[in-house]
């Protein structure tokens, strides 16, 4: 008897379930989102940050600012990876490409260029975006970069004017500056060449010390190199080296001398002279916007002072820049933006360039 009751109950549940299923209304199409797309059309991208990862108070965090802005503005979805070593780039690029679910895969920093080119060739139907390195010969890659020399040129002009000037309390009479270079790559050399050109444009007799740190995640070595430059007489040291830059800031604090960084998130109001600004977050926002609007194209895009992407900034710093110094920097900016001054792109070009270009 119990078996019969159980059988009746099972049959009843099955029939009831079928009845409910057959009685459901036809599913309505999804409502479009605020940007005019259905949820299925929302841009989805993957991004691989540079070595050092998030929390570096520098380059990666600036990129991540753009990621968050793009997600908020366009409702974009994303996945990300934080490699701890250069050897991981290819594996992570391949992992995202294998998934086949991203509108683009974004690689951050020049160290990823070779891995990206290799993987992009193997996945011709997958779009890739390269940040800060020129790749213009692949049909599925769009590369975006700021002018590396232009990012550092105006801070170089400021440094050339500030050294030996007693209106800047942490300067000294030695007429020596320093630049801590992340790695021996075209990008890093281009950055350094901009600073050196700016300093020599404003101050032809200045001596500029340079050292290679060897990586973007080595603040200990960076501090040691910066201390050497300060001890040799430099009163201002500039750096663009991801989380390694933290070591240069520590050295500046210890020696009570000036430092110039590249992120508004990494400043020390007491010893920072300026920040060499590159609005890298705009690259991410503009890239996702092009996917959202269907205007994405492969090739190479470079932006600088003329587009408002590169500049110097003293926001949040204790330093007071005299009006006559600001006027000279403004004049230099106008000449670069207009094309009157075309900057050198590598260190071996600086001396010849400076011999022909001097501030009036």
Identify the role of each PLM range.
Residues 23-360:
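A residue-level marker of the well-folded mature domains of exported/periplasmic proteins
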Residues 17-21:
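C-terminal motif of bacterial Sec signal peptides marking the signal peptidase cleavage site
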Residues 9-10, 23:
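Intrinsically disordered, compositionally biased charged tails
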Residues 1-9:
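Bacterial N-terminal signal peptides that target proteins for export
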């Amino acid at each position: 008897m119990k078996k019969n009751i159980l059988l009746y109950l099972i049959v009843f549940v099955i029939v009831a379930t079928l009845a409910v299923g057959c009685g459901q209304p036809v599913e309505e199409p999804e409502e479009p989102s605020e940007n005019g797309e259905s949820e299925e059309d929302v841009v989805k991208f993957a991004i691989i940050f540079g070595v050092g990862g998030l929390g570096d108070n520098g380059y990666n965090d600036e990129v991540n600012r753009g990621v968050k802005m793009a997600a908020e503005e366009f409702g974009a979805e994303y996945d990300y990876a934080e490699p701890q070593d250069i050897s991981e780039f290819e594996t992570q690029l391949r992992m995202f490409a294998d998934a086949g679910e991203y509108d683009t895969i974004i690689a951050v920093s020049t160290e990823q260029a070779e891995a990206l080119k290799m993987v992009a060739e193997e996945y011709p139907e997958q779009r890739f975006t390269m940040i800060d390195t020129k790749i213009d010969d692949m049909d599925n890659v769009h590369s975006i970069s700021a002018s590396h020399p232009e990012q550092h040129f105006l801070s170089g002009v400021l440094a050339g004017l500030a050294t030996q000037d007693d209106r800047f309390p942490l300067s000294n009479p030695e007429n020596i500056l320093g630049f801590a270079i992340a790695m021996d790559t075209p990008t890093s050399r281009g950055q350094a060449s901009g600073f050196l050109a700016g300093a020599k444009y404003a101050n032809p007799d200045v001596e500029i010390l340079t050292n290679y740190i060897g990586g973007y995640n080595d603040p200990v070595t960076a501090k040691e190199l910066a201390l050497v430059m300060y001890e040799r007489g430099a009163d201002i040291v500039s750096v663009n080296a991801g989380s390694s830059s933290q070591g240069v800031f520590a050295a500046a604090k210890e020696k009570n001398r000036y430092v110039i960084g590249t992120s508004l998130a990494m400043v020390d109001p007491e010893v920072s002279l300026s920040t060499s600004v590159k609005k890298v977050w705009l690259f991410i926002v503009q890239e996702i916007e092009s996917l959202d609007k269907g205007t994405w194209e492969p090739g190479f895009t470079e932006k600088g002072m003329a587009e408002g992407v590169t500049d110097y900034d003293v926001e949040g710093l204790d330093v007071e820049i005299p009006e006559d110094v600001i006027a000279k920097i403004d004049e230099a900016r106008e000449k670069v933006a207009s094309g009157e001054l075309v900057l050198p792109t590598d260190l071996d070009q600086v001396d010849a360039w400076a011999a022909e270009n001097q501030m009036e």
